[in-house]
A protein has these predicted regions:
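Long, non-catalytic architectural segments outside compact domain cores
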Residues: 1-58
């Protein structure tokens, strides 16, 4: 379970980093790419956290 928590935390950190890159990007295509990546990383972290929460209730 700890490895899943660590994975979720890492994905959230990656999402934050992707958002930083998106904010500083001058190229529109690059900005949109990193915005999509940030959303994707957050979604993955949410899924992991949902599995963790579901396992706690079992």
């Amino acid at each position: 379970m700890e490895d899943m928590k660590a994975s979720a935390e890492k994905l959230r950190a990656e999402a934050d980093y992707a958002e930083q890159i998106a904010r500083s990007a001058t190229d529109v295509q690059k900005r949109k790419l990193y915005e999509r990546l940030a959303v994707h990383f957050k979604d993955l972290a949410d899924e992991i956290e949902k599995v963790i929460a579901d396992n706690k209730t079992e």
